[in-house]
Amino acid sequence: MKKSAYPIEIIQKQAPYHPDPTMIFNHLCESRSETLLLETADNKKKRSRKIMIIDSAMRISSEHNAVKLTPLSINGMEILLVLKKIISKKIEIYRRKKNTILIFPNIEKDLDEDKKLFSLSVFDAFRLIIKTFENREKKSKAMFFGGLFSYDLISVFETLPKLKGNQKCSNFCFYLAETLLVLDHQQKTCLIQSSLFTKNSNEKKRIEERSVEIKQKLNQKLNSIPKIKIKDINLTSNMNNFEYGSIIKKLQKLIQKGEIFQVVPSRKFYLPCPNPLSAYQKLKKSNPSPYMFFMQDQDFTLFGASPESSLKYDEKTRKIELYPIAGTRPRGRTKDGNLDLDLDSRIELEMRTNHKELAEHLMLVDLARNDLARICKPGSRYVSDLVRVDRYSHVMHLVSRVIGELREGLDALHAYASCMNMGTLTGAPKVCAMQLIAEYEKEKRGSYGGAIGYFTDLGNLDTCITIRSAYVEKRYCYNQAGAGIVYNSIPEDEVNESLNKAQAVINAIKNAHY
């Protein structure tokens, strides 16, 4: 680290433990934007810490080759003042009201993979911030960036058809945490951690007082999540079953011609959702998943319960991990909705022995191996889990895990840039599949199929694919789901699969407003 790097001061305070992170989030954040809740389902696992961004120092968003930096406090403003002194002349800087806009050079998309990967890009906005400050105590979350990479971010790096979007979702949207709350369910502890990026004594006093205020609030009885009832919840879609089935059949013809091997078309479902946090609480209870998230932005709210990791990276071991999911069946239930264990096991057996499902799954495992081959040390890739079954409230999936060791000179953001978007949401070959998806879906995907999670200044990254999720704008929900199409797919089954995948979120929203 350069001697000129600015030190980060960490302020920590223990607070009363509460077992329900959703209630805590509601109590502390209410409807404030630039707040985030990230959690996992299994409290027995070591990694089952719930992390909340209570206050953000800065909002960092991107569209095309521009990055917008919006300071949200004096603490965040200090970061901008420091950045302006060190920014490369290759990056243009503009000031618009309280925002600072960084314009990066367009990436030459016909470059080879490595040259493209090392080209100056919008990801360098994060690298600049990280390199400017020094984490002397090596605290794991001194600089904690939490937020969303949208599916459409790929258009910065690859040539894809230009599409219109009817949502305000940026290519990426992240918050640099000023105050974090970390719940540890094993130890039953609650830690308030604040990061100070300035030597301003008044700002330090404000942040210390804010920590005391949060602790005092957690000593109080937690506010209940408000309820909003809706008499009639009308579910609509941008494609009916026939239209979606027709797209599947057209794509199958391209598979038969050999243009692609597999592709994942999707459709959107719409329904009112004036109370997203209540719907999220219902979704957690009905469909607990490895990754659960609730993000409140100035433009949207995003929540979900995702079964699938996008990309995970541990800087200490330099191990990078992908978790392809492909192969889906509904859970075995009786007519009254109760789980039938015998039927459930027979459905699992049928899925495990289905040639189409196995072919599709192994194709995506191979695609994950290829993704890692570009960025990992030769000979370091391996499949640690192959074709096992994960179960959720409405569906079960075939899953595998692929691991490799990241090459020297690359970081977690290089890895994400190389691997996006995940093959289980695109197809194979990946770029060709994404081009066809754009051609047939005809609009931006936004958050769907991108990734949500966090990365830190120490280099660690943990994200999940944004599926089984609800994107809410102006009290209205966009719930998107797709199906993996191969040569011998049955269109009617794939149409039903897309609805089965969307059902958990749809039911949660309905139950929250009943």
Curated annotation (Swiss-Prot):
Q: Which cofactor does it need?
A: Mg(2+)
EC number per UniProt: 4.1.3.27
Detail which positions bind L-tryptophan: 40, 290-292
Report any Pfam family annotated for this entry: Anth_synt_I_N
InterPro entries the UniProt entry points to: ADC_synthase (IPR005801), Anth_synth_I-like (IPR019999), Anth_synth_I_N (IPR006805), Anth_synth_I_TrpE (IPR005257), Chorismate_C (IPR015890)
In terms of Gene3D superfamilies, this protein maps to: Anthranilate synthase
Cofactor binding description: Binds 1 Mg(2+) ion per subunit.
Entry's Gene Ontology molecular function annotations: anthranilate synthase activity; metal ion binding
Q: Which reaction does it catalyse?
A: chorismate + L-glutamine = anthranilate + pyruvate + L-glutamate + H(+)
Give the family, as the similarity comment puts it.
Answer: Belongs to the anthranilate synthase component I family.
One GO biological process term? L-tryptophan biosynthetic process
Fill in the subunit field for this protein.
Answer: Heterotetramer consisting of two non-identical subunits: a beta subunit (TrpG) and a large alpha subunit (TrpE).
What influences the activity of this protein, per its activity regulation comment?
A: Feedback inhibited by tryptophan.
Residues binding chorismate, per UniProt: 327-328, 448, 468, 482-484
**Enzyme category, top tier:** lyase
Pathway recorded for this protein: Amino-acid biosynthesis; L-tryptophan biosynthesis; L-tryptophan from chorismate: step 1/5
Entry keywords, A to Z: Amino-acid biosynthesis, Aromatic amino acid biosynthesis, Lyase, Magnesium, Metal-binding, Plasmid, Tryptophan biosynthesis
What task does this protein carry out? Part of a heterotetrameric complex that catalyzes the two-step biosynthesis of anthranilate, an intermediate in the biosynthesis of L-tryptophan. In the first step, the glutamine-binding beta subunit (TrpG) of anthranilate synthase (AS) provides the glutamine amidotransferase activity which generates ammonia as a substrate that, along with chorismate, is used in the second step, catalyzed by the large alpha subunit of AS (TrpE) to produce anthranilate. In the absence of TrpG, TrpE can synthesize anthranilate directly from chorismate and high concentrations of ammonia.
Binding positions for Mg(2+) per the UniProt entry = 360, 497
Q: Which residues form a coiled coil?
A: none
Q: What is this protein called?
A: Anthranilate synthase component 1
The lineage's top-level taxon is Bacteria
